C-alpha cells in the first residue's frame, strides 16, 4: 500500500483525473494560425523545404504545456508532498517534449527558428515553415490504460502553403499500480517515428 498510494496520487496529478483541471479540447492544428483546415494536407508528400525554416507550434501544443503546469499546481495544493511520486511528475514534464522535438528538427534543419505565427515567419525572411501539432489520448484509470501520443508535422513551402504532413505515433499501456507511466519514452518513440519519415520525404 505504501508504494501504490504515491503512484496513484502522482498519476492523478499528472493526468488530472477525478476533479482536477479539465483536459483542454483538441482543436484543428491550424486553428488561429492558418485560414483553412489541416485535414486536406497531403500525407507523406515529398518536398524540398526552403531555408531558413520557421518553427510554429499549434494551439494543442500550447494547451498541453499549460494543462500540465496547471494540473501540477492544482494537485500540489491538495496532495501532501510526502505522498507525491516526483519521478512521475518529472516524467510528464512538458518541457521534455519541447526540448526533444526541437533537438530532432535542428538535426535536419540547422536554420530552424521558433516564431509565433506565419506573419512573423514571412517578416523574418523564412523560406519554409514547420508547424508542430500534438495530440494526446491519456490513460483512463478505470478504463483503457493506454497513453497515446501523436505528433503531426506540417511542412510549408516558400509561399507558406502546406505541402506535406508527417505523423509520429507511439503508445504505452500503463500497468495497474505502476510507479511510472513512461511518458517520456512514449514521446521519444513518437519523435523517432516522425524523424524516420522526415528522412524519407523531406529534403
Predicted regions and their residues:
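Extended alpha-helical regions
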Residues: 1, 113-127, 192-203
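Sec-dependent bacterial lipoprotein signal peptides
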Residues: 1-18
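A structural "domain/chain start" motif
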Residues: 18-99, 201-203
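Surface-exposed short loop/turn segments
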Residues: 28-31, 111-163, 174
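Soluble periplasmic/extracytoplasmic beta-strand elements of cell-envelope proteins
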Residues: 48-59, 129-133, 150-154, 165, ...
